[in-house]
Regions:
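Short amphipathic secondary-structure patches
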Residues: 5-59, 81
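Glycine-centered secondary-structure boundary/capping sites
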Residues: 27, 31, 63-65, 101
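Acidic/negatively charged segments and metal-coordination signatures
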Residues: 1
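N-linked glycosylation sequons
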Residues: 17, 24, 40-47, 67-260
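Signal peptide-directed extracytoplasmic domains
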Residues: 54-66, 70
């Protein structure tokens, strides 16, 4: 039942009925009898619990007159705000009143000031230097995701300059890797699709530095051009993924943890 509650938790907190159905379907597909499993969503739709009973043979207790009996197993999965993630992309977005399905600019082009902040750097267009400065490191991290953990409160250096060619190559690669049918959209997407970007939500932290306030997920849609036209846009998602959960700021990206 551990895997069943983890499967169901993917739909919390927004769709508790579907969470129960997903957990039941997963349990039944793995040999649990329907009449021997009970499921419950609780904690303001942020937790799901399963209890399953199974008939087992008692080998060593037979000398006491017990041949078989019911063994119960329970599991609980909890969802909460992500406070640390792996695989983030080197783009930073400042806090908005994020709305599901709305399009946001994750990197601007030269001459566009949607997210530029003079407190950070006049030459900053939204890119982050997660492993150090340089276009090659930036492109690798944008293409494949950062191979390390980021957490709320971390101070990050920004990657100055427009770096349009590395940005376009990386996003084009991610979009080409979406081989799902139908093509992933905000209403119907695979949770492992490369078009999904884990993006740090940031605030200024001094010259050429920013501080992580939380994390958000976006479905990347386009990187239309180069130079002044090289911007990255994505639609905001509310979803559950793997990662450390806690009491930090929530921006729609939640993690799941097995707590029992």
């Amino acid at each position: 039942v551990d895997a069943a509650v983890l499967a169901g938790a993917q739909e919390l907190p927004h769709n508790p009925e579907l969470a129960l159905q997903q957990a039941e379907d997963y349990a039944l597909a793995n040999g649990v009898e329907k009449e021997k499993i009970s499921l419950e969503v609780f904690n303001d739709n942020k937790a799901i619990k399963a209890q399953a009973n199974k008939e087992v043979e008692f080998f060593f207790a037979r000398v006491l007159g017990f041949n078989s009996g019911q063994v119960a197993h329970g599991a609980t999965a909890l969802v909460g705000n992500m406070v640390a993630v792996n695989g983030a992309v080197p783009l930073g977005i400042q806090e908005h009143n994020f709305q599901f399905g709305e399009q946001y600019t994750l990197k601007v082009g030269a001459g566009d000031t949607d997210i530029l902040n003079e407190e950070v750097s006049p030459g900053w267009f939204g890119a982050l230097a997660l492993e150090g400065p340089g276009a090659k490191l930036y492109e690798d991290n944008l293409t494949y995701g950062f191979n390390g953990e980021l957490k709320i409160g971390d101070i990050l250096d920004v990657q100055t300059g427009n770096i349009s060619n590395p940005t376009k190559r990386a996003i084009d690669y991610r979009m080409a890797q979406c081989t799902h049918s139908p093509y992933c959209t905000v209403d119907d997407y695979s949770r492992d699709c490369p078009k999904l970007l884990k993006v740090p939500v940031i605030e200024p932290a001094g010259h050429k530095q920013v501080r992580i306030k939380g994390f958000a997920m976006f479905l990347v849609e386009e990187v239309p051009g180069q130079g002044n036209e090289n911007f990255v846009k994505g639609r905001f998602l509310e979803t559950v993924t793997t990662g450390e959960i806690g009491t930090g700021s929530g921006f729609g990206l939640m993690g799941v943890k097995l707590v029992q």
